[in-house]
A protein has these predicted regions:
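C-terminal segment of N-terminal export signals and the immediately downstream linker at the start
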Residues: 23-49
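Surface-exposed beta-strand/loop patches in extracellular or lumenal glycoproteins
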Residues: 54-77, 264-272
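Catalytic cores of eukaryotic secretory-pathway lumenal/extracellular enzymes that build
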Residues: 540-580, 612-727, 739-771, 775
Length: 915
């Protein structure tokens, strides 16, 4: 089998042929060679090497996947890849993620088996891949799927309520009955006992069958055994690697209930572990903070009045088989049946600052508190010297309230539940935070917007269709591991190993539009900007910790605006609370990672991508697949928008990792613009222009900024991934008709034909401009489109917009017939000026871009204000915090993007003293 084979990529087989049908595609010769798009040879950049994100190789490597970019034209669709660590060939499986317009590979994904640890500077290159010593094998039958990694064999069901029928090592069954569970109850105020529901399989798809990596996708809904109700759709992916004993689980559920009548009391993954041997040889483990580990036996032999012997105690503490009872001191051995054995165990993380471990002997008996701590590592284990299961939930304490529960450890089979939301915390309360009785009319809602910045509307603050994705790990082990090894597994759960390439190589491939370049401190002016970029990231990293921006529905997001009087972010004030990707926070973080390669930046951006792509977007229901504007509740605003769900925010993570769930989210946005026919943004401010919602509409009004920019990002990504000519044609039609408008981008928007992507031409030459049009990813997607598709009128229209938005009023009047009004965020738009300067080779325009960037609009926007915070202590605040009252997330994200892109585009023109 070719190393590039992948079932869901079969339809891309015709891509090379399609490339010949792109007469308007830009050729390499038509692209000016700049620092942003030079080849590796021209720039002296390093080749396609890989490195471990955290620097050092991991102690445990259970299988890893990463993405690699390639220069245009370097590798064909038929290219296979090898991975070489010096003279050593490492087994690797490869597949395509995206293609350049000429059909050559733009991004590929690569996977290596468990136990293989490529050294830094290992080289990915064209060649015949080495096969794994024991290739992973997937066997499919009518009712099951079997995945054999060479170490474990997992049998998966195609129907029913059990997903993982069994996992075996050799002849021994280690795990059985893997299933999804949910608890449903009435409103959070209801005292009734919740109903247990099981996840029922609808479809199972083998997305990847090896030989290094297998991916199995399971979809279905949670079902009630009493009334037959099916709710909470789920998508679960199971990942296996050759030579591995682990299963990685990506668990997604979508909320489709009525939060006013019912609520989720718990949701998680449950499985059974057969136990063999004496109760004193059964071991329980939970990870704490750092390398801390709680470890006990179901029945202890330590601390007793009669000592069984030093060898017995040492073996139990180490998790090894104890000597035969007949060899113990008989005063202890003959009385062991009188020592209480503990059947049920629990690690419960109730908040970001506290966890509790407890145990009990049986149902109906009291729980004993065994330990307490602050932030658990999220790993548990139950087993014996003859086999057991380690299991963990990533971001365990950050995503509280979670629980790892073990039941029946005194029986032949222990039950394990990894609660992603623990029932001990009470039910999820997803109801609106206000009744809105005083805001029933549009006029009242607009008045509310004036005071709280909240765009409230009854019925629009519901969580219908919001989703949550969690990452879990399961290890089927031959015996209870040492404490040191369990601490290593806990580290995998906490920070899974990640492989990346270097910023220099990424940059040399000219991906992501050439709008960024590796961090450069070669002179004092550049260093000053780099210092400010680093400070901004560190400040938000610190605020997440100090302000406790954690929790199941919150982790990954940041707050929007600060309240200096309360010394608190405005968590309870309408549109000033959660940020929800406003003004491209995600893009700022990802570009900061691309240019620095720093692990802490990657993981901050990764958490935000998971959150904003799942929680801040409606994946089903009346608002799907639109995102929701910033609000006290992530889904609370009535402004449902493409600019929040935009594929631009997800592209970076997808291409860097090949993550299939994020791939789903990208595909989900392909037809998102159709939602504008039923959720009309201007219904409150221009009710006379609103038409009746029509799900079968053939056209919609779309702005050229946040609307079309988001649609274009989705079409571009789908075209790159699949080669679908319909996506290319939509892009070309929309670009061509934007370029043909009387005022180009300054026309503002138009009627978009949904089938073709073409805009109707405006009947007048009125100038329309919004300061928000270009700050939700439009700059980034247009840079790629100009690079990829040769549409001269579009290119000209975009360069006009970039040049004139911040131009002097006299120049605007000369070119447009009037001076622009409402063109705020001038500092943020300095990067548009820089793009025009670079593209046109205009030195004067480059100098103007730096003036716009440095001066800003207010004194606190430029570098003139030192990036400082002050410590605020009690009794002014609940606990000490660092405060920078002048900081806003909008300003930080846009300043960061302007800094990064101006440095990349016109860095050679930077003034010596940017202060």
């Amino acid at each position: 089998m070719s190393s590039l084979t992948r079932r869901d990529f079969v339809r891309s087989a015709a891509l090379a042929a399609l490339a010949t049908q792109l007469p308007r595609a830009v050729s390499a010769a038509n692209i000016p060679t700049t620092a942003a798009n030079a080849t590796p040879e021209a720039s002296g950049a390093v080749g396609p090497t890989v490195r471990w994100l955290d620097g050092a190789p991991p102690a445990v490597q259970s299988g890893v996947t990463w993405g690699m970019p390639w220069p245009r034209g370097k590798n064909t669709k038929q290219t296979t890849f090898s991975l070489r660590d010096g003279a050593t060939e490492i087994p690797v499986q490869s597949w395509p993620l995206a293609f350049w317009p000429d059909g050559s590979l733009k991004w590929t994904a690569h996977a290596v088996p468990a136990g293989q640890v490529p050294a830094a500077d290992s080289l990915v290159e064209a060649g015949t891949p080495r096969a794994p010593a024991t290739p992973l094998v997937v066997r499919e039958t009518g009712d099951s799927i079997e995945v054999d990694t060479g170490v474990i064999v997992a049998r998966l069901a195609r129907a029913g309520a059990v997903i993982v029928t069994s996992v075996r090592r050799g002849e021994q069954e280690i795990l059985r009955g893997g299933r999804l569970v949910a608890l449903r109850q009435g409103t959070p105020d209801t005292a009734a006992e919740p109903e247990l529901q099981a996840g029922e399989i609808a479809t199972v798809t083998v997305e990847q069958p090896g030989p290094v990596r297998a991916v199995v996708k399971i979809e279905g809904r949670h079902a009630s055994a009493t009334d037959g109700r099916r709710w909470l759709p789920f998508v679960v992916r199971l990942y296996f690697y050759a030579g591995g004993e682990a299963i990685r689980v990506m668990h997604t559920f979508v909320h489709d209930g009525d939060e006013r009548k019912e609520s989720i009391r718990g949701i998680g993954l449950r499985f059974d572990v057969p136990l063999r041997g004496e109760l004193h040889d059964r071991h329980i483990r939970f990870s704490g903070e750092g390398n801390g580990l709680f470890g006990e036996a179901v029945r202890t032999v330590t601390g007793l009045r009669r000592d069984a012997g030093a060898a017995v105690r040492a073996a139990q503490i180490a998790g090894e088989a104890t000597p035969p009872v007949a060899s113990w001191d008989p005063r202890a051995g003959k009385r062991m049946h009188l020592v209480p054995a503990f059947a049920d165990w629990s690690l419960f993380q109730s908040s970001a600052d506290g966890f509790e471990i407890r145990k009990r002997t049986a149902e109906g008996c009291s729980w004993l508190t065994a330990a307490r701590g602050q932030r658990a590592g999220g790993l548990g284990y139950v087993g014996t010297p003859k086999g057991g299961v380690a299991f963990g939930v990533r971001n365990f304490w950050q995503s509280y309230p979670g629980e790892l529960a073990i039941a029946g450890a005194t029986s032949d089979v222990a039950g394990v539940t990894a609660w992603l939301w623990s029932p001990r915390s009470g039910a999820m309360d997803l109801r609106g935070y206000r009744d809105g009785a005083e805001m029933g009319t549009y006029a009242e809602q607009l008045e509310g917007l004036e005071i709280t910045y909240e765009d409230y509307e009854p019925g629009f603050d519901r969580p219908e269709g919001v989703a949550r994705t969690s990452e879990l790990f399961i290890w089927a082990l031959a015996a209870t591991p040492s404490r040191a090894h369990l601490a290593q597994l806990a580290e995998v759960v906490r920070t899974p190993p990640v492989v990346v390439t270097t910023p220099e190589y990424l940059h040399s491939c000219d991906v992501f539009g050439g709008l960024w370049a590796p961090a450069d401190r070669s002179n004092s002016a550049r260093a000053a900007i780099e210092d400010r970029l680093d400070w901004a990231f560190r400040f938000y990293e610190g605020q997440r910790e100090e302000r406790r921006w954690y929790g199941f529905w919150n982790f990954g997001d940041v707050m929007h605006t600060y309240d200096a009087d309360r010394h608190e972010w405005r968590y309870d004030v309408g549109g000033f609370a959660w940020d929800n990707s406003e003004l491209s926070t995600d893009i700022w973080l990802w570009l900061h990672f691309l240019r620095t390669g720093r692990a802490e930046v990657f993981r901050f951006a990764e958490a935000m991508t998971r959150h904003t792509g799942e929680v801040d977007v409606h994946h089903l229901g009346r608002f799907a697949p639109l995102g929701s504007r910033h609000n006290v509740l992530h889904w609370g605003c009535s402004a449902k928008q493409l600019r929040i769900s935009t594929a631009t925010n997800r592209r970076y993570y997808y291409y860097l990792t090949g993550d299939e769930r994020v791939g789903d989210l990208l595909h989900e946005q392909v037809e998102a613009v159709r939602a504008l026919a039923t959720v009309q943004a201007n219904r409150k401010v221009a009710p006379d222009r609103v038409t009746a919602p029509d799900p079968n509409a053939k056209e919609v009004y779309a702005g050229f900024g946040t609307d079309w920019g988001s649609a274009a990002a989705a079409w571009l990504t789908e075209w790159e991934r699949t080669g679908d000519p319909k996506m290319r044609d939509r892009l070309l039609a929309s670009m061509r008709t934007i370029g043909a408008q009387p005022r180009g981008f300054f026309t503002g928007g138009g009627r978009l034909e949904l089938a073709t992507g073409a805009f109707a031409l405006a009947a007048n030459d009125r100038v329309t401009v919004s300061h928000l049009s270009a700050v939700f990813g439009l700059v980034e997607v247009c840079a790629e489109l100009v690079q990829l598709l040769d549409e001269p009128a579009f290119r000209s229209a975009w360069l006009d917009y970039c040049t004139l938005y911040n131009a002097p009023a006299a120049e605007q009047r000369q070119r447009l017939g009037e001076a622009l009004r409402g063109n705020n965020l001038r500092q943020a738009h300095s990067r548009l000026t820089a793009f025009a300067a670079r593209t046109n080779g205009d030195a004067a325009l480059a100098r103007r871009a730096w003036r716009e960037f440095i001066e800003g609009e207010r004194g606190d926007s430029g570098l003139s204000r030192p990036p400082e915070s002050r410590r605020v202590n009690g009794p002014d605040v609940l606990r000490p915090v660092d405060e920078a009252a002048w900081v806003s997330t909008n300003g930080t994200a846009q300043w960061g993007l302007a800094a990064i892109e101006c440095l990349a585009l016109v860095g050679e023109s930077i003034p010596e003293d940017v202060r």
